Regions:
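Acidic, glycine/proline-rich low-complexity segments that act as flexible tails and inter-domain linkers
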Residues: 1-36, 58-60
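Short acidic alpha-helix initiation/capping motifs at coil-to-helix transition points
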Residues: 12-17, 47-51, 99-106
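Beta-strand segments within the central parallel beta-sheet cores of soluble alpha/beta enzyme folds
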Residues: 36-39, 67-74
Length: 111
Protein backbone atom coordinates (compact mmCIF):
# COMPACT_ATOMS: atom_id res chain seq x y z
CA UNK A 1 0.00 0.00 0.00
CA UNK A 2 1.42 3.36 -1.02
CA UNK A 3 1.77 5.88 1.76
CA UNK A 4 0.30 9.26 0.87
CA UNK A 5 1.82 11.20 3.74
CA UNK A 6 4.70 10.30 6.01
CA UNK A 7 3.32 11.48 9.36
CA UNK A 8 6.58 10.78 11.19
CA UNK A 9 8.42 13.13 8.86
CA UNK A 10 5.76 15.73 8.04
CA UNK A 11 3.86 15.97 11.33
CA UNK A 12 6.44 14.93 13.89
CA UNK A 13 4.78 16.47 16.95
CA UNK A 14 1.38 15.09 16.02
CA UNK A 15 2.82 11.65 15.42
CA UNK A 16 4.64 11.72 18.77
CA UNK A 17 1.40 12.64 20.54
CA UNK A 18 -0.47 9.87 18.76
CA UNK A 19 2.28 7.35 19.59
CA UNK A 20 2.21 8.43 23.26
CA UNK A 21 -1.56 7.95 23.37
CA UNK A 22 -1.19 4.52 21.79
CA UNK A 23 1.43 3.50 24.40
CA UNK A 24 -0.89 4.70 27.16
CA UNK A 25 -3.86 2.75 25.82
CA UNK A 26 -1.76 -0.39 25.36
CA UNK A 27 -0.79 -0.16 29.04
CA UNK A 28 -4.37 0.13 30.33
CA UNK A 29 -4.90 -3.60 30.75
CA UNK A 30 -6.89 -4.52 27.65
CA UNK A 31 -5.46 -7.42 25.73
CA UNK A 32 -3.68 -6.32 22.57
CA UNK A 33 -5.85 -8.53 20.36
CA UNK A 34 -8.96 -6.67 21.54
CA UNK A 35 -7.26 -3.32 20.99
CA UNK A 36 -6.51 -4.30 17.40
CA UNK A 37 -10.17 -5.21 16.83
CA UNK A 38 -11.17 -1.82 18.24
CA UNK A 39 -8.63 -0.02 16.05
CA UNK A 40 -9.81 -1.94 13.00
CA UNK A 41 -13.47 -1.15 13.66
CA UNK A 42 -12.74 2.56 14.08
CA UNK A 43 -10.67 2.46 10.89
CA UNK A 44 -13.56 0.79 9.02
CA UNK A 45 -15.91 3.55 10.15
CA UNK A 46 -13.38 6.25 9.23
CA UNK A 47 -12.65 4.65 5.87
CA UNK A 48 -8.89 4.61 6.44
CA UNK A 49 -7.38 2.00 4.12
CA UNK A 50 -3.85 2.58 5.45
CA UNK A 51 -5.03 2.01 9.03
CA UNK A 52 -7.00 -1.10 8.07
CA UNK A 53 -3.96 -2.55 6.35
CA UNK A 54 -1.74 -1.85 9.36
CA UNK A 55 -4.18 -3.05 12.03
CA UNK A 56 -5.21 -6.18 10.14
CA UNK A 57 -1.53 -7.16 9.88
CA UNK A 58 -1.05 -6.47 13.59
CA UNK A 59 -4.19 -8.46 14.46
CA UNK A 60 -3.05 -11.43 12.37
CA UNK A 61 0.37 -11.31 14.06
CA UNK A 62 -1.45 -11.60 17.40
CA UNK A 63 -3.29 -14.71 16.17
CA UNK A 64 -6.57 -13.17 15.02
CA UNK A 65 -8.52 -15.35 12.59
CA UNK A 66 -9.37 -14.34 9.05
CA UNK A 67 -13.00 -15.25 9.72
CA UNK A 68 -13.31 -12.72 12.54
CA UNK A 69 -11.47 -10.02 10.61
CA UNK A 70 -13.78 -10.48 7.61
CA UNK A 71 -16.86 -10.41 9.86
CA UNK A 72 -15.80 -7.42 11.94
CA UNK A 73 -17.88 -4.97 9.92
CA UNK A 74 -20.98 -7.05 10.77
CA UNK A 75 -20.00 -8.07 14.31
CA UNK A 76 -23.56 -7.72 15.64
CA UNK A 77 -24.84 -10.39 13.25
CA UNK A 78 -22.14 -13.00 13.89
CA UNK A 79 -21.49 -15.46 16.72
CA UNK A 80 -17.72 -14.91 16.48
CA UNK A 81 -17.26 -12.25 19.18
CA UNK A 82 -17.47 -12.52 22.97
CA UNK A 83 -19.69 -10.30 25.09
CA UNK A 84 -16.58 -8.38 26.20
CA UNK A 85 -15.55 -7.82 22.59
CA UNK A 86 -19.09 -6.81 21.64
CA UNK A 87 -19.16 -4.22 24.41
CA UNK A 88 -15.81 -2.81 23.26
CA UNK A 89 -16.93 -2.70 19.63
CA UNK A 90 -20.21 -0.99 20.54
CA UNK A 91 -18.33 1.64 22.55
CA UNK A 92 -15.88 2.09 19.68
CA UNK A 93 -18.72 2.74 17.25
CA UNK A 94 -20.44 5.18 19.60
CA UNK A 95 -17.24 7.11 20.28
CA UNK A 96 -16.14 7.14 16.63
CA UNK A 97 -19.58 8.36 15.55
CA UNK A 98 -19.98 10.82 18.45
CA UNK A 99 -21.07 13.58 16.04
CA UNK A 100 -24.23 11.54 15.35
CA UNK A 101 -25.34 11.52 18.97
CA UNK A 102 -23.91 10.56 22.33
CA UNK A 103 -22.68 7.53 24.20
CA UNK A 104 -25.67 6.14 26.08
CA UNK A 105 -25.45 5.44 29.80
CA UNK A 106 -26.56 1.87 29.09
CA UNK A 107 -23.52 1.36 26.88
CA UNK A 108 -21.19 2.65 29.57
CA UNK A 109 -22.80 0.21 31.99
CA UNK A 110 -22.02 -2.69 29.63
CA UNK A 111 -18.37 -1.76 29.44
Amino acid sequence: MRERLNYVKEATDGYRAMAALNRYVEGCGLEHSLLELVKMRASQINGCAYCLDMHSKDARALGESEQRLYALNAWRETPFFTERERAALALTEAATLIANGHIADELYAEV
